[in-house]
Amino acid sequence: IWANIAMIRAFHEANGEGEQRREVITTIFSHPSNAAAAKAAGYEVITVYPDAEGYPSLDALKAALSPRTAAIMVTNPEDTGIYNPAIREWVDAAHAVGALASYDQANANGILGVTRARDAGFDVCHFNLHKTFGTPHGSGGPGSGANAVSAALAPFLPGPRVVRDDDGTFAVAEGGELSIGAVGPFFGVIPALVKAYSWIMALGAEGLLAAAETAVLNNNYLMARVLGIPGASAPYATGRRRIEQVRYSWEELYQETGISSEEIGVRMTDFGMHYWTSHHPYVVPQPFTLEPTESYSMAELDEYAATLAEVAREARETPEVVRTAPHNQTVHHTHHDDLDDPERWAITWRAYQRKY
């Protein structure tokens, strides 16, 4: 994502509009790392909110666009699992004011072989190899990604990089004078790149499409099971299917029992189940985001849904069991009061000496 915004900035600077274009537009349900990268690059970030059904508002985008806009940076489908059907209109609107369009394809798991960034007219995009192409997650994602650009942005690609010559051999090419240079040391985590490439080549075009279709099927099957649990809901797009994930809410259960989504998630670890953490920012109350992908069987999805239902039952009948979880882990319940108080934060030794 940093490479994307760095190339966008270099493009506008090369065209003499670097000082003019100081704003980046994103959506509230796009990955927050897009807004963070733009902010770190010195841009003012404008966030567009969805309409009542959860779809990114095209009218709100057009109202925010101006000659000061450097780019739109959006995830599609968004983290709600909702695909923006007007994505081409979004890109065209950005181009109409001279801005570029950056596509965060972190949620491409459900659209492989169905649609492409090029089809919507994007100028630059990236994939999360650990979310889409079978590489290890690596505690938040290994330091390797795949960026793709239009011809207009090709001169700004990071360098040096590995290229394929006309005779099929590979070589290391230095970046040109417009290149943003090296984004990270070496070429990232090479084993992750090799594994992703091997995974793609092993599946082929038909296999990638099958993976996407299975991911969508698994997600919508799990959604039907989860929405059958009293206290769970899926805000927005009422009655409509989602792509590869859903941002659910435990708000109804929380109002009834006082047990939060975080407490339910921690209790799930006692059953050896996934503890959800990816639902920032907290726009959906008491959120939990599930993304089953193509990897799980129906039996595994049934087991997960049944465990959710069991913990929801515990929240009503034995809430202290949930509130004091985990009970079956090496580290039991910990308090996070310090994390919620900036006055106690000490992320450096100097800060620790100053505060303690």
What positions do the PLM features span?
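Catalytic-loop motifs flanking and including active-site residues across diverse enzymes
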Residues: 141, 188-195
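Short glycine-enriched loops at secondary-structure junctions
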Residues: 29-31, 189, 281
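Non-catalytic terminal extensions of PLP-dependent enzymes
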Residues: 16, 115, 165-183, 193, ...
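Short glycine/serine- and small hydrophobic-enriched flexible loop segments
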Residues: 6-10, 197-202
